[in-house]
């Protein structure tokens, strides 16, 4: 069976709350690091989330 090219990543809050989302991305089409504005329930507002390696 072929191994998928999608890699699991962690989107971590830049607010310093420790909250994170997990998702996957295609490494071939998007080799750069992702950054999204998402809701942080700890900070109770939308903050930038940056991609970090999932351990």
Curated annotation (Swiss-Prot):
- Any keyword Ribonucleoprotein? yes
What is a single cellular component term in the Gene Ontology annotation?
cytosolic large ribosomal subunit
Q: Which domain of life is it from?
A: Bacteria
| InterPro entries assigned to the protein according to its UniProt record, in alphabetical order | Ribosomal_bL33, Ribosomal_bL33_CS, Ribosomal_bL33_sf, Ribosomal_zn-bd
Which keywords does this chain's UniProt record carry? Ribonucleoprotein, Ribosomal protein
Q: Which Gene3D superfamilies match?
A: Ribosomal protein L33
> What is one process in the GO biological process aspect for this record?
translation
- Coiled-coil segments: none
One Pfam family hit: Ribosomal_L33
GO molecular function annotation: structural constituent of ribosome
NCBIfam families in UniProt: PRK00595.1, rpmG_bact
HAMAP family, alphabetized: Ribosomal_bL33
| PANTHER family for this protein | 54S RIBOSOMAL PROTEIN L39, MITOCHONDRIAL (PTHR15238), LARGE RIBOSOMAL SUBUNIT PROTEIN BL33M (PTHR15238:SF1)
Can you tell me which family this protein belongs to? Belongs to the bacterial ribosomal protein bL33 family.
Protein's name according to its UniProt entry: Large ribosomal subunit protein bL33
What organism is recorded for this protein? Azoarcus sp. (strain BH72)
């Amino acid at each position: 069976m072929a191994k998928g090219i999608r890699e699991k990543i962690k989107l971590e809050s830049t607010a310093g709350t420790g909250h994170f989302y997990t998702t996957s991305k295609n490494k071939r089409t998007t080799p750069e690091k992702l950054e999204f504005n998402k809701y942080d329930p700890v900070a109770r507002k939308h903050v930038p989330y940056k991609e970090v390696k999932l351990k």
